[in-house]
Each structure stands twice: as structure tokens, then as C-alpha cells.
Amino acid sequence: MGLLEFFNRQHLKGRESDSNLRARVKSFETAAGMQTAGPEAFDLSKESESTHKLYGLKRGDTKSFGWQCMVGRRLIERGVRFVELIDGDTRIDYNWDAHANMTNYDRLARNVDHPIAGLLKDLKDRGMMEDTLVVFATEFGRGPFQPTPGVNGRGHHSRVYSSWIAGAGVKGGMVHGQSDELGDNVAKDLVTVHDFQSTILHLLGIDHERLTYRHAGRNFRLTDVHGNVVKQILA
């Protein structure tokens, strides 16, 4: 690695203004750093039994959501700025794609509930919640009605569903928004996807109105022209 770094630095001489080249060198350095630091971050053998229990995790388990949560905390401790955890699988008996069957939702929810609660407690106990934002979300909900008689499933439902945020800059222990009595439409305090994104960006210290990309001679906002920060949930 030292030899590669030497050649990269030699190649950069006289080309310091080439941002693409500097970024290329930086990407190689980042990749090398992941290879050297990654194995230690993913090694849970030194975590205590009580911590494993907190996440509902058995030693040696590398597939569960609890494993993802504990690794996520370890990555954040080591300076990783963005971590994504995903629950679900492609197996027909373990995924959230409930078009034909929702009877496994209780089991799916239990498998997520224990680890995510453990993660929040662990972050708080370690003093990490003050500068960590936890966003628990999905791409859409499930409708309140059976679209096909006799089939215990639900279709995609984008009109109303829930997400939650915890951590830095967010009020705790509150609910914002309300559905109608059937869970079919929003009845109060609508939060659009653009509002949700705007609020997350605000909590990350980013002005969503200035975060733009250039296309066809115009500047476009990632939150479009509709996004507004949901100030009611801010601490």
C-alpha cells in the first residue's frame, strides 16, 4: 500500500488542480482503509454478553437485524457518517411484501422491535444520541382493505403510513399527524415525502432549498418546490 501511495503522489505532482484525479486517489485510499479497518469493526466477539442480549443477538449470528443494529453502532463509533440497515429477505416466508399474506407481520415486527429498541438504548447510554439521527422508515404502507376477497394480503398504500425519527434535534415521545379512522387517508397534519426529506436534511445541517443539481439549464431541488421542514417535531 505504501508503494501504491508513493506512485499516486508522484502522479499528482504538477496536477494538483485536477479535482477528478485527486478524488480518484482519495477513493483508493478510502477503499484501502476499509480493508484494514473493516474487519475489526465487524468483529463482535469482544462485545459483552449483556450487549448481545440488549440487541436480542446470539453469538455468531451475522444475518439478523440485531446484528445489523450492533454493527451499525460500531460503525458510527468509528466515524462512519451514514449507515443503512435493511430488514427483510427474498424468502417467501420472511419479507414485508404482503400482497398475498400478512399473517407473518407479527413475527416480522417482533424481529425488528427488540434490536431497534436496543440500538436506541445503547446509543443513549454511550452519549451518542446527541449527534446521531435515527430514521426508521419504509417506502409505503399497506391498505386497510383486502383488494382480493379470500386473500389475506394488502396492496401498496402511499396515502398514509408511519415513520419515526429519534435522536439529534428531535422531540421525543410525541406523535405528529393522524390518519382517518380506517387508516386510509391523512386526517390531520399531512407530511409529504418532500417534507420528510426536507426535515431530515435540516437536522443534518443542510439547507434543502440550496441543495440543487443542474439539469437542462435549470437548478432542481431534491425536495422539489413542495418540501417544507416539519418544525413541530424539532426540539
Spans of features found by a protein language model:
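Ligand-binding pockets and gating/stacking loops
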Residues: 1-235
